[in-house]
Design a protein with these regions (language model features):
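Hydrophobic alpha-helical transmembrane segments of polytopic
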Residues: 24, 31, 63, 138-145
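Extracellular TM2-ECL1-early TM3 structural module of rhodopsin-like
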Residues: 17-29, 56-115, 126, 130
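Transmembrane helix-loop junctions and nearby membrane-interface residues
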Residues: 43-46, 75-85, 121, 153-164, ...
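Extracellular N-terminal segment of 7TM GPCRs
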Residues: 1-41, 180
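Intracellular signaling interfaces of 7-transmembrane GPCRs
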Residues: 48-58, 121-141, 211-213
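Loop architecture of class A 7-transmembrane GPCRs
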Residues: 6-14, 85-104, 151-200
Length: 213
């Protein structure tokens, strides 16, 4: 499928939005602002607090930093996808980079929360094991989280194509070549499949872990 690189001036895109579209942008903006506020406050509290152990402090800082960056990137992504005719016109590399960084950060956040949930189960069920859980092990877990998040979405950065989506407007989206079988169902359908495969499994582990506790 060839990408149609249009240079025509767009109409007022906001005029074409439905009420649901405007609600979507409003909700994203609200969550982004709250995310920046709460995660910045959390980082400040963790750094100043003395009641946190070294291990949990590192984990909470890691999650808060990831979520803070996500909160900053979110409004940028929404603005590019909602208020421009085409995101990154004639620049496929930037389109891929934005998509790759966004998905990597979201997945790193989820994996970090999954790691904490598993650690809590181990602490409750195997307390003697957790006593040997030193700082070096925490750093290894954090490194594993980041490496996994970086590698699992590497196909977006390397082996993907840039296609137009009719989601809100003719914004560009990056679709891994392996997923072209459903590329015609861009936006909602593609995201639903990716989230089901990549995100529901860690979420299920978190649910089971806290259920055991």
């Amino acid at each position: 499928m060839a990408t149609n690189w249009t240079t025509e001036d767009s109409k007022s895109l906001v005029d074409n939005y439905t009420v649901l579209d405007n609600v979507y942008f409003a909700v994203d903006g609200t969550f982004s602002a709250l995310g920046i506020l709460f995660n910045t406050s959390t980082i400040f509290i963790i750094l100043k607090g003395r009641r946190f152990g070294q291990q949990i402090k590192l984990q909470l800082l890691n999650i808060s930093l990831i979520d803070l960056i996500c909160s900053v990137i979110l409004p940028t992504t929404v603005a590019l996808n909602g208020f421009t005719t085409i995101s990154y016109p004639n620049n496929k590399s930037l389109c891929k980079a934005q998509e790759y960084v966004t998905f990597t950060l979201f997945y790193a956040s989820l994996l970090a929360k999954t790691a904490i949930a598993i650690e809590k189960v181990v602490a409750v069920c195997f307390p003697l094991v957790i006593l040997k859980y030193e700082r070096t092990h925490i750093i290894s877990v954090i490194a594993l989280v980041w490496v996994s998040a970086i590698l699992i979405h590497v196909n977006i950065a390397i082996d993907s194509v840039v296609l137009e989506s009719k989601y809100f407007n003719d914004t560009l989206v990056c679709v891994p070549n392996a997923n072209l079988i459903y590329a015609q169902y861009l936006a909602y359908q593609q995201l639903a499949i990716e989230y089901a495969i990549k995100y529901l499994t860690p979420s299920f582990i978190i649910l089971i872990s806290y259920g055991v506790i």
